[in-house]
Amino acid sequence: MTEELKWATKLNRLVNVCTMHGVKVRFKRGVQDVFSPDDKDIVINSNRTKEFQLYVLLHEFGHYLIDADPVLQKKFEPVSLAIKHHIVKDQVLILEEEVLAWHLGEQAADKYWISIGPKFRGLKSKCLKAHIKVLTKVHPKKKE
């Protein structure tokens, strides 16, 4: 089995897990990877390798798991407002939610017997660094 086929098999298994949870997964070229809680829909950029798509889907599934838990959903409710209005005091919640989504995605991989490679941690670090960079950027309309 080729490497790409191995990752495609794991990706397909995770798509099936998402479906079991009532989450629709779509693959589109050139889009931003995102989980939409209102639609219970995850969109993944299909331009990337199957391994990369798997890791991103694990992360987005982590966002679904946060949204599916009433306690976590309430905790992270201010995140969308913080993003939209650059509310500084809530921006740490954005980073906290991102870290938790990666963690829950990794736990889901273990739970559903989906092995991940060392590139997972590298992608996780890269994405979290990007979030930190965006969150520490100076915005003209900051509110405390």
Label every model-predicted segment.
Residues 52-60:
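Short alpha-helical catalytic segment bearing the HExxH-like zincin motif
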Residues 9-10, 49-52, 94, 106-144:
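Long, well-structured alpha-helical subdomains associated
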Residues 60-63, 98:
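Acidic active-site catalytic centers that drive phospho-/nucleotidyl reactions
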Residues 4-52, 64-68, 73-74:
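Active-site scaffold of zinc-dependent metalloenzymes
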Residues 1-28, 93-105, 112, 143:
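A metal-dependent hydrolase signature that marks the N-terminal structural subdomain at the beginning
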Residues 34, 67-99, 103:
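Post-HEXXH active-site segment of zinc metalloproteases
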Residues 62, 66, 105-109:
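Hydrophobic residues within well-ordered, non-membrane alpha-helices that form the packing/core
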